[in-house]
Amino acid sequence: MMQFVIAAPRSGSGKTTVTCALLAALKKRGMAPCAFKSGPDYIDPMFHRSVLGVESHNLDLYLSAKNTVRELYAHYAAGHGAVVCEGAMGFYDGQGLTTRASAWELADALDLPVLLVAQPKGASVTLAAEIQGLVHFKPESHIAGILLNDCSEKLFRMLKPLLETETSLPVL
C-alpha cells in the first residue's frame, strides 16, 4: 500500500491543495485512497470527504496516545490502496514551541515517509539549505522527497538537479 505524509516548512505552502490533487489522482487511478489530517482540524477532512468523496479521519497526537493513533490509522487505512496524511502548520511545529503533535511526530509515530511541499519563490540555493536543515533537524526526519509547489516548469527544470544534488532527495 502506498502511504505517506504531506508536510511543509510552514503554513500556506499548499499542503491542502497538494493533498487534494494527490487524492484526486489516486482516486482516478482506482487506488481507493484514504486520507488523514494531523490534529483536530475539521475543515481539511471536510474537503477530502465532501469535495473528493475520499474517506478522511483526524489523527491527533495531542489528544490521543501514540498507540491509539497507530490503532486508528491501521483500522481506517485497512483495505485502501493508498493513504495520504496531511500535516498541519510547519513540519516540526507542534504544541506551543515544541514538536509535540507536529506533522513530524505523526510521521515518526507511524513510521511513514514524508513528501515535503516547498515553494521556491525567491530562492534557489537557499531553498536547498532550508530543506537540508529540515532533513537534519532530527535524527530521523522521514523526509523522502520534495514536491515543488507554485513553481513554473522552467524553474522546476532548473531547481530539480540542484535540489537533488544538494539534498540527495528526489524532486517530484
Go through each PLM region and give its residues.
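Beta-strand-loop-alpha "switch" segments that mediate conformational coupling across diverse proteins
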Residues: S168-L172
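ATP-dependent carboxylate-amine ligase catalytic core
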Residues: M2-L110, A118-H142, D150-R157
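Conserved anion/nucleotide-ligand pocket segment
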Residues: M158-T167
